[in-house]
Amino acid sequence: MLNPKVAYMVWMTCLGLMLPSQAQSNDYRPSYHFTPDQYWMNEPNGLIKIGSTWHLFFQHNPTANVWGNICWGHATSTDLMHWAHKPTAIADENGVEAFTGTAYYDPNNTSGLGDSANPPYLAWFTGYTTSSQTQDQRLAFSVDNGATWTKFQGNPIISTSQEAPHDITGGLESRDPKVFFHRQSGNWIMVLAHGGQDKLSFWTSADTINWTWQSDLKSTSINGLSSDITGWEVPDMFELPVEGTEETTWVVMMTPAEGSPAGGNGVLAITGSFDGKSFTADPVDASTMWLDNGRDFDGALSWVNVPASDGRRIIAAVMNSYGSNPPTTTWKGMLSFPRTLSLKKVGTQQHFVQQPITELDTISTSLQTLANQTITPGQTLLSSIRGTALDVRVAFYPDAGSVLSLAVRKGASEQTVINYTQSDATLSVDRTESGDISYDPAAGGVHTAKLEEDGTGLVSIRVLVDTCSVEVFGGQGEAVISDLIFPSDSSDGLALEVTGGNAVLQSVDVRSVSLE
């Protein structure tokens, strides 16, 4: 859960800035990214698949377009793209709001909250008491396949007094429980974030209700982690195969409030070992640990209970790092497009790699393709294409010293430019002229990521464009940049150009995306 004090300050300072600076026919609402039906959303919660249904819970204010009255919103899908809005899953009540958490299936009914014929699904969340601003950990359960959720009568399951020996903030900074069953030890594991102390704590339970502290993972115990990376939040933890080997490794994913490549919050992942009580981190590489180099990928979590026959680790995050500031009036916050996360060796380094889920192909139609064509300085390709919901894929061999530029959401005076600069192997997103950037000091600028040519000299770039966002995937997905943009409706053009040398286009595929 993002820091409530910061969110409250943003709310209070921005109430007078809610009107957009330019008229928009759809209030910038995306075409194929999830947004709440109305009002405020931040990070996803409790991502779980139950049967054939994907469940998305999320931090939500159901009464206003600002942070506050936080509960778990709920939506379901059978394909991770078409979402049905559902009633509030876990409400704020009696002065206690429902902050971030996770869900898991209890097939053996170890919690005793279901029965052997109908085991429960469980959701752990942070209870935020508004009067004291303190946080404790709570439990809810479902015995109807996630349709409705009941709060456990014995809440909290970890009180502020139980947290006290491990929390120097007096209950102000202990939140976002990640819970899973650890097969090797036969225990349930809870990972808590302590943003004010830059640490995670690990707890165990035999029954999902009674918890015992086991260890802390502190920033000082992670070799190579910068001291500038502070305010740890929203942990996730899972085993991930190392592609091309028979090995798996434990991964901890979290969202620091400060220290990301684009400034402010961002999502990082580290590998290590876990013995059922403590996590030992591998030395980190600052060049590979960040999952996204853009400004708008925050509070990522992964879906659990995904069948082995599927085998994917699918993650999503909220795209909004500006509080109430973005120029939308009926909604705030959108979900990143779901992406797979894997771990593989790229060149000489081990990388986390991400790609949009393949289901996207089922809702996209090719508009134009090119193959084996050389583009030279002064040429502009793709300029006949118009669209605000696109999937653009470009694979090319750049000349030494060349810069390949793909402009999206291009208009008379607006464009968002994705560049690949061959001389320093840099992928970038330039929002300087992307549209409305007046709403926040961090809304413009250029975000960069390192992207090396492959062994043959090929560079691959994939760009998901929607009404108010770009998500750029470079190479095999080892370089990712996600950013919000707010152009005018009329800025719907596309342009592919090169400067400083030629580029041989191995393939180009521009696809229109539509949920209809």
From Swiss-Prot:
Subcellular locations according to the entry: Secreted
Documented effect of changing T110A: In strain: AF10
Active site: E43
Positions of substrate binding: W40, M41, N42, E43, Q59, W67, F99, T100, R175, D176, E233
Taxonomic source organism: Aspergillus niger
Encoding gene (name): inuA
Catalytic activity: Endohydrolysis of (2->1)-beta-D-fructosidic linkages in inulin
Residues carrying sugar: N109, N210, N372, N419
Described function: Endo-inulinase involved in utilization of the plant storage polymer inulin, consisting of fructooligosaccharides with a degree of polymerization (DP) value from 2 to 60.
Temperature dependence: Optimum temperature is 55 degrees Celsius.
Pfam families: Glyco_hydro_32C (PF08244), Glyco_hydro_32N (PF00251)
Statement: the UniProt record of this protein carries the keyword Hydrolase: yes
Name of the protein in question: Extracellular endo-inulinase inuA
